[in-house]
Amino acid sequence: MTTSYLERVISFDSIRISKPTILENGIRGDITITSGGSAKTFRLIYTYSEPVAVDERIAGLILTMPVINFTYFVRELRLDFPVGAADLDLIRHFLKVNAREVFVNKICRRRYEFIRKEYIPAESDINSSNSDGMTEVIAPLSAQGSYEVRGDKKNSAVLSSGGKESLLSYGMLKEIGERTFSFFFNESGGHWITAKTSYDYFSRNFRDVIKVWSNVDRFYKFMQRQVKILDQFAVTRWADTYPLQLFIFPVYIFALIPFLIKHSISSVFIGDEFDDPREMPEFHGLKHYYGIFDQSLDFNRLMSEYFRSIGIDSVLTSAVYPISGNVVEKILLQRYPELFSLQRSCHSCHYENGKIVPCGRCSKCLGIQMFIKAAGGNPTAIGYESISTEELHRRVLSERMRLDSDELSFMKSKLFDNNEPEVSHVTGMHILPGEKNPGELMPDYVRDKIVEILSKYTSGNFSLINGEWVLSEQ
């Protein structure tokens, strides 16, 4: 009998997450992987910037989130801590979604050759049986009751990273009078360098800066060494993405839960800017999220429903989901120049002459430089080298850009052809399918004030009609 593709890529018989150890300002637990009778263990650590109260249920779930990045390759996920029915439903859903995202976007639609050639699927292997994984969750269903945590509508938190979306979200929330907690997650890897400029400035100048330190990036490297389909030489080369990990924001959000409870935070703002729903066709009949499930509105809804189901009165939302990246950059640069100066939108930031600067050449950096120039700014203000528009054009043409096609075409036309379209949805505010007005997915107690700010920098409201974005009548 022929072995299925899914069977061939399995690397672990089980992954076990231990009962967590809870400290005054942190948690830790052991992640044990077994394969063929041998076992290896990694101790995962989270340290909070202030004392927090957390029980075994939440602590165990916090430890579980990084592991889900690798569960496509395991038969059993064993949880040695109490969970409730809502927790188990969420984990099973996460496992299925992440399995398909890894299969489609890291193995089939890969941007880098991290996968050993013998494990690249044949055309006949690309089906739902192989994409949805086989992982069974084994856990004690013993957690009872809910947390009865009331959120204060004046208290919001922003997942802060040094990127334009989180900086703009912070600026708008502060301006409209919210008590805004900036939450930083130091995963002890290169991504912290990206956030450090903002973190250092916020710590010196603003109140309510909260942080978690974790060794999760070291855990990722530990796990990558155990996954047999990975080319261990290829994963050491430079890339602007992880070899397998696509389940990043749940790690941050679950780590934030003890702070949500302690500070009665009612809204968590994540930097989901506009993604054109027309740009997401199925892959061989497989519906997927193009590797950004955890930055989708579906994910926000799912987490908000989960919080409600366990008695935490908080929602996960976005203040920038109606607008494209170029508009985010424009508002940040023109309305909040102090925050703009902190922006480091690059996963390969490094030190030069004592300052943290972006690489300037990855697809993310090239997009940011286009946005800044289009908004009338100077990219050198946030650490980019001084290059001509012609050189930027050459670099853009040679790179696989990761922008929605309409936005990329608009930017090229405006910057490189001096031919800006008169009307384009990429400079407007989007009314998504199911909405009657822009911003309806934001909490009602901040919506109108945020939409008012956005409207000052956009070219009107656009609705999707018969597959085209059409300017609404004013």
Language-model-detected regions and their locations in the chain:
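Nucleotide-activated chemistry modules centered on ATP-dependent adenylation/adenylyltransferase
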Residues: M1-D30, R109-S156, S166-Q474
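Short Lys/Arg-enriched alpha/beta "domain-start" segment
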Residues: M1-F73
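Low-complexity, highly charged intrinsically disordered N-terminal segments
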Residues: E50-Q144
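Edge beta-strand plus adjacent loop/short-helix module at the start
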Residues: L159-S160
